[in-house]
Amino acid sequence: MYTNKQIWSVSFPILLSLLAQNVINVTDTALLGHVSEVALGASAMGGLFYICVFTIAFGFSTGSQIVIARRNGEGRYSDVGPVMIQGVMFLFVMALLLFGFTKAFGGNIMRLLVSSESIYEGTMEFLDWRIYGFFFSFINVMFRALYIGITRTKVLTVNAIVMALTNVVLDYALIFGKFGLPEMGIKGAAIASVLAEASSILFFVIYTYLTVDLKKYGLNRLRTFDPALLMRILSISCFTMLQYFLSMATWFVFFVAVERLGQRELAIANIVRSIYVVLLIPVNALATTTNSLVSNAIGAGGIQHVMPLINKIARFSFFIMLGLVAVSALFPQFLLSIYTSEAALITESVPSVYVICFAMLIASVANVVFNGISGTGNTQAALLLETITIIIYGSYIVFIGMWLKAPIEICFTIEIVYYSLLLITSYIYLKKAKWQNKKI
C-alpha cells in the first residue's frame, strides 16, 4: 500500500497547483470587491455560469484521468497517449459548440435567472469576454489528466504559478487601468482570466515537448479520430461529466436564490464562497490523489489495498482541515478584510464563515471517500450518489432561499447537509456494493 510519503508526494504538487489556480478566484473577488458590490455580484454570476459549462470538460478529463491511471498502473504506457490525444480532439470540438451556444443563448438564460438589471448587465459584460477561455481551459484539463494519471504532478505547481502570476498582473492592470492599459473594470477581469489560461496551455505544450518521453507514452505522433477509443473513454467520462455539471449547477441555483435576497447578500455569498473554495484546496488535492492512486492500485492488482488507502487519505485530509478551520474560525474578520474594507459587510459575513467552517470538516472526509468510488471506475454509481444528494440539495436551497428567504448564513447550512449525505451514501456504497471487478 502507498505510504504517507508517497501519498503526499503526489498530492502536495496538486495542492500547490490548486492554490496557485485559486489565486485567480481570490484576485478577481478581492479586486472587484473594491470596485463595487454590483461588479462583485456580477462576476459571481458570470463566473459560476462559466464554471458550470467548464465542469463538463473537467468531468470528461477526470474520466480520462481514471483511464490513463489504470493504463499506467498496468504498465501499458504506450496506451496513455492515444487517450490524451482523443481527449484533446473531443474537447476542442466541445469548446466550439459550447462557445457558440453561449454566444447565442447565454443572454436569454441569464435574463431568466437574474432579477437585477444592473447585475444582469455586469454579468453579460463579464461573460462576453470570459467564454473565450473555453478554447484554452478545455485543453488544459487534458494535460492535467495526463500528469495526474502518470503521477508526475510537480509540473502542475509550476504551471499554476505561471497562470496565477499572469492573472494577478493583468487583473490589476486591466481592472484599474495600470501600466498604460485602459481601465476596463469587470471586463478587464474576464480578459485577464482568458489570457492567464492561454499562458497555461503554452507552458504545458512546451514542457511536454521538452521533458516527457513522447515515444514511451505514445505521444510521438498525431492520430486520426478513433471513435472506438473515444467511446471507451466516454463510457467512464460521461458519468463524471454529468456529475460535475450537476454539482456546479446546484451552486448556480444557490447564487440565483441568493441574488433574489439582494445585492448585499450576493456580495456576502461571493466573498464567503471564495474563502470556502480556498479551504477546500487541500481536500480537493487529496481527493484527486485518491482517485488516481486507487485506479493505479487496482491496475497493479492491489484491490485489497483500496479501502485502507481511502481511510488513510481521509484521516490525513481531516486533520489538515481541522487546522485550517481553527485558524479561520479564530480570525474570520482578517480573512474577510482581504476581500473588502467595508466594516458592515465584514461583520455581516462572519456568521456564514462559521457555518462553512463546520461544513468543511465533513467535506474533508466526504470528498476523499466519494472520489475513491470514481477511482474504482464505477463512475455510474458515483453519478447516482451525487444525483440523490443534489436533488435534496436543490430542494433545500429552493425552500429556504427562495420560499422562506432565510438569512444568508442559514442558506449556507446546505453545505452541511450536502457533505453529510455524500459521506453517508459513499461509505455505504464502498462497504456494501460490488465495485472490485470494474473493467475499463
List each language-model region with its residue ranges.
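Transmembrane helical elements of multi-pass membrane transporters/channels
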Residues: 9-28, 129, 163, 196-200, ...
